[in-house]
């Protein structure tokens, strides 16, 4: 839904509808970290990061940021996202969704391969997602992840971000700042 000049209320309603849908779909999920915070916190953080980097209103992009894990993690179809929200939102979510039928190593490899071919808007979601995940690794790492595994995740996340063809400069600076904290692990 493209924002009209006096359509802030509709945009807010659309965002809240997406946030509620994401919250309901991810209700049973917790973050992997020791704090086991509700998964919706991650989705809200990704959307907030994208919002801070925008230079214009893009409600669909923010909705896609909120919904970016609904297909991959809880099986919401692209068709359902298109029906409930819009084809644009569904397409953005699809761009950042891994194929769960593949093994984890292949999914990770393909994120690097596909990164430069995604739209600029999808790249914003991708980098914001990586920022959020790295922040979690620093602030509340999963108890069952060794230091080596966390460092490998940081390295892989950097490979994905470095492969992006047009990373948003605000998000790239934020990513670089959190990546530098790798030495703090």
Which positions does each model-derived feature cover?
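Active-site helical microenvironments for divalent-metal-assisted chemistry
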Residues: 2-185
């Amino acid at each position: 839904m493209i924002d009209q000049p006096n359509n802030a209320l509709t945009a807010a309603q659309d965002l809240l509808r997406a946030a509620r849908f994401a919250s309901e779909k991810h209700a049973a999920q917790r973050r992997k970290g020791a704090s086991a915070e509700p998964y919706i916190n991650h989705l809200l953080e990704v959307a907030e990061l994208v919002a801070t980097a925008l230079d214009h209103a893009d409600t669909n992009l923010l909705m896609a940021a909120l919904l970016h894990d609904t297909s991959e993690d809880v099986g919401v179809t692209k068709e359902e996202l298109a029906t409930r929200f819009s084809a644009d939102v569904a397409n953005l979510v699809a761009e950042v969704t891994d194929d769960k039928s593949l093994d984890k190593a292949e999914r990770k490899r393909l994120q690097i391969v596909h990164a430069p071919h995604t739209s600029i808007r999808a790249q914003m979601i991708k980098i914001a997602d990586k920022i959020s995940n790295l922040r979690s690794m620093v602030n509340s790492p999963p108890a069952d992840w060794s230091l080596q595994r966390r460092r490998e995740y940081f390295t892989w996340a950097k490979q994905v971000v470095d492969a992006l063809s047009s990373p948003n400069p605000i998000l790239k600076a934020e990513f670089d700042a959190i990546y530098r904290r790798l030495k703090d692990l």
